[in-house]
Amino acid sequence: MDAYWRASNYLSVGQIYLLDNPLLSEPLKREHIKPRLLGHWGTSPGLNMLYVHLNRVIKRDDLEMMYVIGPGHGGPSLVAHAYLEGTYSEVYPDISQDAEGLRKLFKQFSFPGGIPSHVAPETPGSIHEGGELGYALSHAYGAAFDNPELIVACVVGDGEAETGPLATGWHGNKFLNPARDGCVLPILHLNGYKIANPCFLARIPREELQKFFEGMGYAPLFVEGHDPADVHQQLAAALDTALADIRRIQTDARVNGNLKRPAWPMIVFRTPKGWTCPAEIDGKKCEDYWRSHQVPMGDMDKPEHIRILEGWMKSYRPEELFDGDGRLTAELAALAPTGRRRMSDNPHANGGLLLRDLKMPDFRDYAVAVQSPGAATAESARVMGSYLRDVMKLNLKSGNFRLFSPDENNSNRWQDVLEVTDRCFMADIYPEDDHLSPDGRLMEVLSEHQSQGWLEGYLLTGRHGFFSCYEAFIHIIDSMFNQHAKWLKVCNEIPWRRPIASLNYFLSSHVWRQDHNGFSHQDPGFIDHVVNKKADIIRVYLPPDANTLLSVTDHCLRSRNYINVVVAGKQPSPQWLTMDQAVKHCTEGLGIWEWASNDKGCEPDVVMACCGDVPTLETLAAVQLLREHLPELKVRVINVVNLMKLQPSGEHPHGLPDRDFDALFTKDKPIIFAFHGYPWLIHRLTYRRTNHANLHVRGYKEEGTTTTPFDMVVLNHLDRFHLVEDVIDRLPQLGARAAYFKQAIHERLIDHRHHIEKYGEDMPVISGWKWGAGSAGKAQGTSTKGDNV
């Protein structure tokens, strides 16, 4: 085993430094070394030793195991093991198991046209790149859920352990059911240093460290030392103990029905940073110090550095590790598992291999009956929740669907799912608790990071899910979204990576209905962030009512390798489309609402476009005012569900061709666009369109407070009155005919201000507005006064 460790260390150093002469079959020269040295050595030897010992128990016990490494900058390590196990050559036949293959393996690392420095999607066996630190445990627990035979060995770097998401990630054990789920074996890689500083967990007494992890609900096992022979013995014993404890816990739960939360084992692995590299270089400490974090020697134009590198690599005795052709010796190769038991070839690390379609009810069965536009009222999110309840019910037996939320499931109106499942919870449960159970499939923890990380781990290992969150607070995982989008982008370019289920976001409690919580809860900017990513990855939907939301939800759950963002409200609101109309509208992604328009057979005077449920409501109210006061005006109403339809077809696969866009929006008529989010996003998406100069967008412009629902749109000039004023200002031909109308609009806004400041609620003429009923009508129930979450 020590020889196998030396082989993986040799390959790790070779990837960082060598361009040629992979077996050091001739004296090392400057031309054998890369001109630019990139990569990270410091964590690699520790990762290598852990991998070798995990292989021992996998082979001995025929285990199904994955390796998730938080310090993903140790890319040379996982690539080395994938190569030594043969997996690398299977998926990349050009990297053969001989001296020439070794040369190519070394050259390609962190080299133009080669592979990245981290455990990116190109690395067989990886589901976690580890470039942005903090999510290793979240991904590991997500992978373990509903995988009862899987053990996820999760290495946590001591630097990563200082991040917020990782600090919360330890609590994943409060949601892991030993009867139903697999196991996560956390391994704290305590090598003492980050890039240029010590790690605080390495500088506190062992007793304090032990108490910390015991307080987290773990039974820590310590492996500590500098001498490899001693550490080999300690690590072997610790793994044997950990696996025995895991088997005991799982047997007790699965055979005896004991679901009391156990103290799962974990390992504290304290070894030197940069282990086995030169102790000093140029008179400065290197091994067991931060200088070994990346490339211990950067200036290879110094002959002395070449001699040091050669001596370092020869210290691993490559002649004992590889035969004359450059192949790993048969004796060492026999130490590794074979086939799918190899961690580099575990199918869970290529989740698309295991992905099975969800059993889906017909979403049309959940339709809201709409006799005429605006006649019915419904809570769109609650209707969606009823549909998801039955998706959950149909897939309980297969155990491949979960919902995730940071304590916002009920607030976002998905409580119907609790009719068929509970909230997963392994801590103490009291009699008065609401739907808590170790067997629950609703994952609620007040951490957007854990919700996102668990879902990613769940998806990456071949399952399905949906993430519900307040719109403003989804920003907390902006960078996690980034990393998953990057992962999917690269996976699309790797033939052996199979497609996985899409990552689906449902954003509710949105900006226009956060009047009760105030300014801190008002931010629609996540969609701006999303559209920065690759067009073949991201999708953004803003359904205007429940039936369109049902159609979009069904589509998202059937899609693969996308990130779908769905934004819709949870408050009672008018319903516009029948189910048949909704399906057609969502299929097209946008279109003219003929029933709201009066320009058929002629050119419109103005186009009124809307995207989002509240902007749609305000647009239709504005159109009705225009019909009443300027009946001769020809108005075309366009609603947008699929935001990416606005981009040209050359920019996004869903984008409308210019000819079709011009036919809808005209080439020269004013366009008043009421948008759910920040208005400049619409300008970004449409700046190349013919009629962009006539496009005027209203949306959220960072005005908000605790106020009434209608005042929110007034503050941002998205209300019906400002929209009407925008039309008048852009149609000079109206002249004096519009003067009195415009004055009446200003007076109505003054009335609004006086009314809310006196009574604390919107005017009945606003809250009671109804399409087709004139300026006032039966209440639609858009108030949020009863909603304090």
From Swiss-Prot:
Q: What EC numbers are recorded for this enzyme?
A: 4.1.2.-
Q: Does the keyword Lyase apply?
A: yes
- Write the protein's name: Probable phosphoketolase 1
Superkingdom in the source lineage: Bacteria
Q: Which Gene3D superfamilies match?
A: 3.40.50.920, 3.40.50.970
Q: Per the record's keyword annotation, is Lyase included, yes or no? A: yes
The UniProt GO MF terms for this protein read: aldehyde-lyase activity
* Pfam families in the cross-refs: XFP, XFP_C, XFP_N
Task: Give the cofactors, semicolon-separated.
Answer: thiamine diphosphate
The record's listing under CDD domains reads: TPP_PK
Q: Which InterPro entries match?
A: Phosphoketolase (IPR023962), THDP-binding (IPR029061), Transketo_C/PFOR_II (IPR009014), Xul5P/Fru6P_PKetolase (IPR005593), Xul5P/Fru6P_PKetolase_C (IPR018969), Xul5P/Fru6P_PKetolase_CS (IPR019790), Xul5P/Fru6P_PKetolase_N (IPR018970), Xul5P/Fru6P_PKetolase_ThDP_BS (IPR019789)
Q: Give the enzyme's main class according to its UniProt record, as a single word.
A: lyase
UniProt entry keywords in alphabetical sequence: Lyase, Thiamine pyrophosphate
HAMAP family assigned = Phosphoketolase
Which GO terms of type biological process are on file? carbohydrate metabolic process
Q: Which family would the database say this protein is a member of? A: Belongs to the XFP family.
Instruction: Recite the lineage of the species.
Output: Bacteria, Pseudomonadati, Pseudomonadota, Alphaproteobacteria, Hyphomicrobiales
Q: Organism source for this protein?
A: Rhizobium meliloti (strain 1021) (Ensifer meliloti)
